[in-house]
Design a protein with these regions (language model features):
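Catalytic alpha-helical scaffold of carbohydrate-active enzymes acting on polysaccharides/glycoconjugates
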Residues: 1-140
């Protein structure tokens, strides 16, 4: 039998955060993670419901960089339900959070939309920072 991995990029929207402002974490969560629609939620909770009903486990690639803006509690709110339901969490990284982070940017003056916008040493530093945030949020 062929092994199949169901993977889901799981992230707060940096664009929505820029439009609504950094104080709108709850709304960004509802729209980006829960994916609330008039017909109900279609985000991570719904995706896990469907997978659980079919005996399938998913791999959720979680972007922890919003911790620069909201702290690791915002990431734990994403990671904990995934792990509690027996699914896997792995690292996903959007460097555009560096711009939103302002003074909390660990690479002062450096911003970019993609990892290739950074030097190799900066990429390594970003991955290390993101890994630490993800682990602080409860990922193994």
């Amino acid at each position: 039998m062929t092994a199949v991995y169901i993977t889901i990029d799981t992230e707060y929207s940096p664009g929505l955060t820029l439009r609504l402002g950094a104080k709108a974490r709850e709304e960004v969560f509802e729209r980006s993670i829960s994916c609330c629609t008039p017909q109900g939620q279609v985000g991570t909770g719904h995706q896990m419901d469907v997978m659980d009903a079919n005996g399938v486990k998913g791999v959720f690639f979680v972007d922890p960089m919003p911790a620069l803006v909201w702290g690791t509690g915002a990431i734990a709110a994403v990671v904990e339900p995934i792990l509690e339901r027996g699914h896997e969490v792995q690292l996903h990284l959007h460097p555009e959070w560096l711009e939103i982070a302002g003074d909390a940017n660990p690479l002062p003056g450096r911003t970019g939309r993609n990892m290739h916008d950074f030097t190799e040493s900066e990429q390594v530093e970003l991955i290390e920072i993101a890994r630490e945030f993800l682990m602080r949020a409860g990922a193994p």
